[in-house]
Structure formats: C-alpha cells, structure tokens
C-alpha cells in the first residue's frame, strides 16, 4: 500500500494519489508491503530506489545506517504484536532525500498508526523530513516505555502467584508466562539499542537544524533512562524463574517424601509376609496355632518400628 502526505498549514495532510504529480508535492511517502507497480511509481515520479527484502534483513551496522547517492538511509526495528499476541520486531527502512522522507515496511505497525492519528491535530515546528523521522522515533520510544510498564505489571501479578505457593499447574503456567515476558523484554531491548544506534548515526551524519538536534538528544536521553529499567526486568524474570523452580522442587520433594514414608512402613512387613509365603516343607511356624496372628503382629511391629525411629531422627 502506498500512502503520501504533504504539509498543509504546518500539519500533515494525506494525498489521494489520483494525479501523477501528487507524489512530487509530498513530504512523506509511506509504503507498506508495496506492490511492484507502487515501487515503479515511486521510482518513476520521484527517482527514488527502495530497499529490497534482503536489504531489510541485514543486521550489520554498515547495511543499516549509511549515506549514498539515493540519500540518508536508516533501517530500524519497530516492536509489534500480531493477531495471536505474539511479539516481534519488524524492520522499517527510512530514507531522507531532497527534503522528503520515505518509509518502507512489511506490515502495519502500532507506532505508525498512533503517529498518523496524532498528526491530524499536531502542528509541526519546522515541517521537515528530519522532524517527521524524529517524531516517529519518539512515538516508538513511548510505545516501548508502555511495554516495559506492562511487563512490570505482569511480573507483579506473577510474583504474587509464585510467592503464595500455588499448585503445580499454576507454576507451569507461571513459567510459561515468564518465558514470554522475557522474550518481550528482549525484543524491547533490541529496539531500544537499535534506535540508539540510529539516532547516534543521524546526529553524526545529518546536518540537523538546532531544534531537531535537541529533539534527537532528548530521545537519546529517554532511551538511556529506559535501558536500566529494561535490564531490571531481566533480573526480576530470572529471580521469579528461580523461585518458581525452587517451589516446584519443594513440591516434588514432598511427593518423594510420601513415597519414602510408604516404603519405610510397608517394606519390612512385606519382607515378613514374603518370608512366610515361601513354599518350603519344613517351616515349623506354619503348624503353630498362633502362627498367623503372630505373623500379623510381627508385620505391624516391623512397619511401625522403623517409621517411629526415622521420625524421631527427623529423617522423614
């Protein structure tokens, strides 16, 4: 899908893209999973080459942040959750050339959707491509901060479940949720660090106006303040995982203890019963009139004696 926006009274206004000269008046050209015809239109009308899918997947810094004859290029991760609530990071290719911002992405992203909603009533200060880029990065950082807050809330709820000593099935669910929260935290951290590198590159390479330079530094300060919070999440997740595993081990030890008690109580009587159950001809006890009750009494004594002894020694 191809969308374009122009500046009207210092606000973004969406273009209908019916006329061939509409793109030439645009300030921001946004492409989401573009078809080949849309790529060709951008190339024909604006002379702009767009990144390919393999180029979006490159992770080395030289392929994500660079400047060439086609403009200033920044490839940056954006966080999203799909229809099944699975977290992921999607790469967005930003290009600034001739005062115009190009964005190429593979899916609709929450940060872009939120920014377009805000842009309807938001007045731009300078109304240039760099301001748009930094506004999108600001929106992304706000979204990541919200995700960190959500993880904190989820971990607080999990902490109560784990520390209150629930049943084994609830521990299994808690461990699964902890693994999911750790995965989300890792993706958020990856986004933060990637955005930090992108902004440092932008500050070094682009001749930013003073207002955008201060805006970039403000976003960098926000990232630096969020990274320690994100790191503390991993420590909290690790602590809760260890606590949950510890409680699971305690529960397993209780079960093993029950089997140990059963073994201590029933193994000696079983030995007595099996001894008198052997089919030998010369077993004098078999002819005794009190042989059966005597064997029963011996089995009871053989079961109680080791149990009481082990209990006194606190071995059970």
Swiss-Prot record:
The keyword Zinc does not apply. The keyword Protein transport does not apply. Belongs to the CorA metal ion transporter (MIT) (TC 1.A.35) family. Signal peptide: none annotated. It comes from Yersinia pestis. It is a multi-pass membrane protein. One of its GO terms (cellular component) is plasma membrane. NCBIfam families: corA. Homopentamer. In the absence of Mg(2+), interactions between subunits are weakened, and dimers, trimers and tetramers can be observed in vitro. One of its GO terms (molecular function) is cobalt ion transmembrane transporter activity. A motif (Probable selectivity filter) lies at residues 277-279. It is found in: Cell inner membrane. CDD domains: EcCorA-like_1 (cd12835). It holds the Pfam family CorA. The central ion permeation pathway is formed by the first transmembrane domain from each of the five subunits. Mg(2+) binding strengthens interactions between subunits and leads to the formation of a symmetrical homopentamer surrounding a closed ion permeation pathway. Low Mg(2+) concentrations trigger both a conformation change within each subunit and a loosening of the interactions between subunits. This results in an open ion conduction pathway. In addition, this results in a less symmetrical shape of the whole complex. This is Magnesium transport protein CorA.
């Amino acid at each position: 899908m191809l969308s374009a926006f122009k500046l009207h009274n210092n606000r973004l206004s969406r273009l209908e893209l019916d006329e061939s000269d509409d793109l030439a008046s645009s300030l921001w050209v946004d492409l989401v999973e573009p078809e080949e015809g849309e790529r060709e239109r951008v190339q024909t009308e604006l002379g702009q080459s767009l990144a390919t899918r393999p180029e979006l997947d490159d992770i080395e810094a030289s392929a994500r942040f660079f400047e060439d004859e086609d403009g200033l290029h920044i490839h940056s991760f954006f966080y999203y959750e799909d229809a099944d609530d699975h977290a992921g990071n999607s790469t967005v290719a930003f290009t600034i050339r001739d005062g115009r911002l190009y964005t190429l992405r593979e899916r609709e992203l929450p940060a872009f959707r939120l920014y377009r909603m805000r842009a309807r009533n938001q007045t731009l200060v300078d109304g240039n491509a760099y301001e748009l880029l930094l506004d999108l990065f600001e929106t992304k950082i706000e979204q990541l901060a919200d995700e960190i807050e959500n993880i904190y809330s989820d971990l607080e709820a999990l902490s109560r479940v784990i520390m209150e000593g629930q049943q084994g099935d609830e521990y299994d669910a808690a461990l699964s949720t902890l693994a999911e929260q750790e995965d989300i935290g890792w993706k958020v951290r990856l986004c933060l660090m990637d955005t930090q590198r992108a902004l440092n590159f932008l500050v070094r390479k682009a001749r930013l106006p003073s207002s955008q330079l201060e805006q970039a530094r403000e976003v960098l300060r926000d990232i630096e303040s969020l990274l320690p919070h994100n790191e503390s999440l991993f420590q909290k997740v690790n602590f809760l995982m260890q606590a949950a595993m510890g409680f699971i081990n305690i529960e397993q030890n209780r079960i093993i203890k029950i089997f140990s008690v059963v073994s201590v109580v029933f193994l000696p009587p079983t030995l007595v019963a099996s001894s008198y159950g052997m089919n030998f001809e010369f077993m004098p006890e078999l002819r005794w009139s009190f042989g059966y009750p005597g064997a029963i009494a011996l089995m009871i004594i053989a079961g109680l004696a080791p149990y009481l002894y082990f209990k006194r020694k606190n071995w059970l």
